[in-house]
Each structure stands twice: as C-alpha cells, then as structure tokens.
Amino acid sequence: MVDLKRLRQEPEVFHRAIREKGVALDLEALLALDQEVQELKKRLQEVQTERNQVAKRVPKAPPEEKEALIARGRALGEEAKRLEEALREKEAQLEALLLQVPLPPWPGAPVGGEEANREIKRVGSPPEFSFPPLDHVALMEKNGWWEPRISQVSGSRSYALKGDLALYELALLRFAMDFMARRGFLPMTLPSYAREKAFLGTGHFPAYRDQVWAIAETDLYLTGTAEVVLNALHSGEILPYEALPLRYAGYAPAFRSEAGSFGKDVRGLMRVHQFHKVEQYVLTEASLEASDRAFQELLENAEEILRLLELPYRLVEVATGDMGPGKWRQVDVEVYLPSEGRYRETHSCSALLDWQARRANLRYRDPEGRVRYAYTLNNTALATPRILAMLLENHQLQDGRVRVPKALVPYMGKEVLEPCG
C-alpha cells in the first residue's frame, strides 16, 4: 500500500506508475472517492460536535426549549449513524482501491513488459559436452531417480524422487540453510499456510489470488513462499531501532496452483504444484541506503550459492511491467538449462520499500522517537526441484551419472550421484 498523503500530493507520479506497470486502475475514481471520504469525515465531525453541544444545553435549558433540544439531539444522532454507515462503506471501497495502487519503480528500471528486461551480468559459461547430453527427465528415467506412478496418485505437476536424487534434494535445502546461517540470517522452519491477512500484507492478494490454493472449510491458504509468513510475523508491533535490520532465512514447503500456465513446462521438474524453498527476508529502517545495502546482500547471497553449486547464471534487471505492483526494484537470477539452450529463472530479488509494511503494519521507532513504516526485501536462497533440473543437466557425465559440486560432497558423502538399484 502506498502513502495516501503522497498519492494526494503527487498523483502524476502514480499515474505514471500505473501506466508503466500495466495496472488496471482508475486513479481519478480513487481520488474522487478519497475526497468523498474526507467530506464525510468532516460532516460527521460537525454533527458530533453539534450533538455534544446540544447535549450539554439540555440540562440547563428552560422547559419551553428542552423538548426542541432533545428532538434536535435525536435527529443529530440519527444523522451521525447514517454518516458513520456511509463512511464505513466508502472507507472499505477506498481501502480496496488503495491495495491496487502500485509502488513507483526505481528510475533505473527498464520501461515495458517482459521483452524490455535487460541482462546486466553473466557468470560462467554453458557446458560443452563431448557426448549427446540428456535432459533432466531422461537422466532421472535412466537412473531410476523418479517415480512415474506419482501422477496417478497426485495428478499432473507432481513429482516424487528416489535414491540419491531424493537425498540430493534434502542436501541442497540443508546446504542453503547452513549458508544463510553463516551469513548472519536467522534460520526458521515455517508453516506452509497462513490467513488471508498475511497474503494481503505481502501483496499476493488481491493481485495473485488465482495462484493460491484455499484450504477448504478454514480461513487458511497454502503459501507459495515463506515470505508470506515472515512478512506477517511482526505485524502490529513497533520494533526498536536497535533490532534492525531483521534478517530471516525461512524454509517451508510451497504450493502454487499454476493457474494460467496450461501447456508450459508440463514435463519434469521446472513447474510443479508443490516445491521446497528457502527464502531470504530482510526488514530495514526506512532509508534507500539501507534498502540498497540489503538488496545487494540478498543478491550476492544468491550468486554465491550458485557459484558454490558451479552453475552458469546471469542477472536480469526486470522491467516495470514485469516486476509486479509492489516492487521498487527487481533483479532476477537465471541459470542456464542445456536442454533448452537458454537461461531460466531461479531467484527473484525484490525491494519493496514501505509498500508491504503499510499493508502489514510493520513499524519501528527511529532514533528521534518517531514511529515509521519499515522497508522490506526478499529473495530466494534456493528452491527445489527447479534447481535440480539445472544441476542434473549441467553436471551430467557421459555414462548418465551426475557429478556432485564440491560444496555438496560433505552433505552427500559422495562425488557422483549413483543410479537406483
């Protein structure tokens, strides 16, 4: 959510943000509704003031005036009730619209849709094989590393790993948590579900509600990232300045409906309904300098993880129309997938300034004693099984086995993934 005061003072800034981010929102209608709310508040205050004045006059009024004053007080009470009901309705409408207002993006963001995304860095080179390489599905089938019957049990976009590959997935998650702990982040294991308020706080609702599964007969929804829970942990609190920045590494199984992705990545591990994710989350003081420092830290963490996994990757500056309504800046990290001959996203590093904090009521007391909204940031540390597809394809050997990166050998106790059986 944006600062309503700033929205009133600089509507042209938000008109541009709406246009550049491709948000379907009538800002003039929102501002007109805001004016209605202000006028209703003013009129309600006037009515309440007059009603109080009338109530004070009644006990001292002469008999011939008392009945009229009582009638006037009753009429003012009825008018106040009508105004309060109208105000509640208009404020609810205004809040629903304010939830849709995008945060203006940083000046360095390319303007446009996905086609305007710009590569800003490339590390490592795609592998060169002396043999015909296999894709990750063929490698799993050759080595007996996945269970094809799982679709009969759990439907499409499900997966079940076996043998060394099952252990490899678990090793990767522990590796990521250990890495984040060494970087000073607090490791946390978290639930995979939350109430609607938490999704509103991150901005997943209302914009991405179709990607979220509701748990029947409850007020809970399955999360697609630990960010949802982490962002809600301190909702309503006023944190001491000395506690900032908060730096969390949250692990939770994640779920996405993949609505709208019909026909995309239907084979293998690239797009599944349930996956596992270690998420980086930072809450900082409200300054661009602090946010920029945290952004670079989150990005460097992701890069170092990929270097340790010995994977070729690139960084992409995400354009305004592709970054989402709440983002100030977003840089995607993409890893090379040999079977497709292109880079695929594995991480999204995002700075959201106070957009989430206003929605989730995340505040702190600054050194001058003022209560302010914090800034939030997040980035993936590691998500499986997508990263497994990259590891299998980039590290495959001629005999179909797969090499284990040096950083993972202590976790696996071996240098090569062996076939099942």
Curated annotation (Swiss-Prot):
Residues engaged in binding ATP: 256-258, 272, 345-348
Subcellular location(s) per record: Cytoplasm
Family: Belongs to the class-II aminoacyl-tRNA synthetase family. Type-1 seryl-tRNA synthetase subfamily.
GO MF term (any one): ATP binding
Entry's Gene Ontology cellular component terms: cytoplasm
EC number: 6.1.1.11
Catalysed reactions, semicolon-separated: tRNA(Ser) + L-serine + ATP = L-seryl-tRNA(Ser) + AMP + diphosphate + H(+); tRNA(Sec) + L-serine + ATP = L-seryl-tRNA(Sec) + AMP + diphosphate + H(+)
InterPro entries: aa-tRNA-synt_IIb, aa-tRNA-synth_II, aa-tRNA-synth_II/BPL/LPL, Ser-tRNA-ligase_type_1, Ser-tRNA-synth_1_N, SerRS_1_N_sf, SerRS_core, tRNA-bd_arm
NCBIfam families hit by this protein: serS (TIGR00414)
Pathway noted in the entry: Aminoacyl-tRNA biosynthesis; selenocysteinyl-tRNA(Sec) biosynthesis; L-seryl-tRNA(Sec) from L-serine and tRNA(Sec): step 1/1
Protein name, UniProt field: Serine--tRNA ligase
Description of how the protein assembles with itself and partners: Homodimer. The tRNA molecule binds across the dimer.
Originating organism: Thermus thermophilus (strain ATCC 27634 / DSM 579 / HB8)
Pfam family, one: tRNA-synt_2b
KW Secreted (keyword) present: no
Principal location class: cytoplasm
Top-rank taxon, per record: Bacteria
